[in-house]
Amino acid sequence: MKFLLTRLIFVIVLTSTSKIGLSHEYWIDPVNYYLKNDEKLVAGIFIGDNFEGSQIAFSKKYFKNSNLFSNNKKIKIRGRLGDFPALNIKETFEGINIIQIESEVNYIHYKNLSKFEVFSSNKGYKNLADKHREKNYPENFVESYKRYAKSLISVENIDGNDVDTNMELELIFLDNPLKNSKKRKR
């Protein structure tokens, strides 16, 4: 988390859309984690690997379910197709604000095992394609997946805690990471 809090600028790597589809990391990169009451919450959304990737514009494909949580309030995050950076939120609340984003279901069509073999090997599963063949699974198959992302931002103060936003897959901070961060920017 410290890495995410202190790294405010990511290099945008131009990649093809097929590369974005094969990338499995999805993250929110706020311009500032510490806002004043009158500041707009601006954040880029990235897809890539090892925190290097492409910044994407607002699209319903990537924002099927997106909300801002704070002080027992939940507000639907709205955007316009093509907004870049993707998040430009005017309405925030004093204390901890939690951005939660869930994509729609996406699909990767594997026509043969070569791309799957490269991907699974890069993720540390060198024998997975061989096991796939041994089990006589089809070489032409479809993978379905959703992407989930969450970020905490403070407005005016760092009071508050992370909450369960009811995503299918979610990490919840037991301690407030913004209180524990040694470097705060305003």
Predicted regions located by residue number:
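N-terminal soluble domains immediately following signal/targeting peptides that reside
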Residues: 22-186
